[in-house]
Amino acid sequence: MRRQPKTHAFASLCLALLCLGGLALAPVVPAAAQDAGLYDAPIPADAGFVRILAGDGRAGATVQIEDRTLTTGADGVSPYLIFKAGRYPAGETEIAVAAGSFTTLVLGADGRLQTLADEPLASPKASGIHVYNLSALPAVTLFAPEFGRAVVEDVASGTTKGRAFGEGALVLEVRAGDRSLAAFPKRSINRRQAVSVIVTGPADAPRAVLVDNTVVRR
């Protein structure tokens, strides 16, 4: 079989990005949760999704929201939990959960929370990548080295950017200028699946992880 030229493959990727470029990101529900969803009640229309992310990438960080505790896993991020729309005390602050919203609470080393909004996917045909720059680096870029192109560019410190596209497989690399910070093996991102690339740490020793966005029903 004739191998597809890289230029043609990249053109296909660009077309997918352009067609779905106005869409943003949503978490993927694990297979077990999808199976359980055949019998569970549907997610209420007035519900939103909230997760926490440790600004220093640590596992075991917690935030209490009413009677529920969100805890970061090994990669420094928790699953999304489902909350009815409304206002909730969280740590020393208050968060607003809107219907259909996706919120990431960034927990700083001082215990303070920063709220970042992640827009949901607007199409069942979309998949996506979200990049969080929680490091001391002024900006980071997510790069596709196979194609020599940026996927998500110039994510400033303390902010997040995302991009939606058609399903596919990519090798991904995190860069700060010409400096390579981390590279991830080729992986497939399927329809209605989203992943997060999280960069933390000091400018001279940053850490980058790639995680699936997940939802827990409880």
Feature-to-residue mapping (PLM):
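C-terminal segment of classical bacterial N-terminal signal peptides
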Residues: L20-P30
